[in-house]
Amino acid sequence: MDTTTLISRLEAASSSFHNLERQLADPDVAADPQRLETIARERSRLEPLVLDYTSLQKVEAEQVQAKSLLKESRGDAAMEELAQQELQELDRHHADLIQRITLALLPKDPRDERSVMLEIRAGAGGDEACLWAGDLARMYERFSSRRGWSVTPVSANEADLGGYKELILSVKGDAVFSELKFEAGVHRVQRVPSTESQGRVHTSTATVAVMPEADPVEVQIDPRDLDISTARSGGAGGQNVNKVETAVDLMHKPTGIRVFCTQERSQMQNRERALEILRAKLYERQLAEANASERSARRSQVGTGDRSEKIRTYNAKDNRMTDHRLGRNFSLDPVLEGQMDDVIDACIAEEQRGKLADLSEQAD
């Protein structure tokens, strides 16, 4: 990004920031909680960038002074050395600020701020694949807890020996998609199953889909396209188990997408959940089509984002997790405990490098 464009964007961000601060002082805004929250969130997003811009201006002024001092110190070896050291330090600080600001100004995915529907399906490997799907679910629940996100199961098809044939989790919080989007794809595990008496290593897979939540305005569903039926929900016991038809089985006829929702206590709640899942699945389809048409022109995407892409191998024997998109290994045990920060940070850094490469090509 050239200097003129950089400064222009910083000036625009600074102007927006100060305008938002004026709005926050407006009594009419204070009387509208929803508007107040929206403005406060946008102000918080811009604040680090504006502070860095202020620091950049200060450093550039100090660089001018340091260069002047260096020029005046010619002939005085001690003073010249001190001035040179100060200028070098200021140059390093300036370069760091430019790098940080450039990354902050890179194009943002508008979906990054959204909550997600996280779908985990057992793949190849039979019962062990179902257990592996359960392990992945726990990994994401622990990671989400560390982030302060809320996780709610919205649809679950449990396996007889444990784990899940299919599980859909609603993960709600700030910028969930910005981090979990890198999890979409096939996760392969190599380990000795607990049911294996000969100690042989088995390979199993589970598929993860990460669907940003879509609102009814973005994905409109014609009621005539739906087949909706009800069924009795199973449970752990009690008077209402299998007596009241609270489960909802929803079929979207144009796409053949089926959603079966049993987790809520009432039929109405399960119907709303099923529609929420369907909207997310339809939205994911739209995004996949858009990504496919754009992918050849972009370097910024980490992997394809497709649920069929083999993204990771988890090797229990060597306590190693390999991310094939990054070509890097990570310690397995911490990752399975939800300590995924290093992995996610590496994916974000790779995405940023790609965006910088895209910008450089556009500049050329």
UniProtKB/Swiss-Prot annotation:
PROSITE patterns linked to this entry: RF_PROK_I
Keyword annotations of the record: Cytoplasm, Methylation, Protein biosynthesis
GO molecular function: translation release factor activity, codon specific
Disulfide topology: none
Modification note: Methylated by PrmC. Methylation increases the termination efficiency of RF1.
Localization terms from the record: Cytoplasm
Record-linked Pfam families: PCRF, RF-1
Annotated signal sequence range: none
Lineage: superkingdom: Bacteria
Keyword Metal-binding: no
GO cellular component: cytoplasm
Residue list for modification N5-methylglutamine: Q239
Annotated segments matching region Disordered: 289-315
Xref: Gene3D superfamilies: 3.30.160.20, 3.30.70.1660, 6.10.140.1950
Main location per the UniProt record: cytoplasm
Composition skew (Basic and acidic residues), residue ranges: 306-315
Database matches in InterPro entries: PCRF, Pep_chain_release_fac_I, Pep_chain_release_fac_I_sf, Prokaryotic/Mito_RF, RF-1
HAMAP family the UniProt entry points to: Rel_fac_1 (MF_00093)
NCBIfam families documented for this protein: prfA, PRK00591.1
Functional note: Peptide chain release factor 1 directs the termination of translation in response to the peptide chain termination codons UAG and UAA.
Annotated family: Belongs to the prokaryotic/mitochondrial release factor family.
Listed name of the protein: Peptide chain release factor 1
Native organism: Synechococcus sp. (strain CC9311)
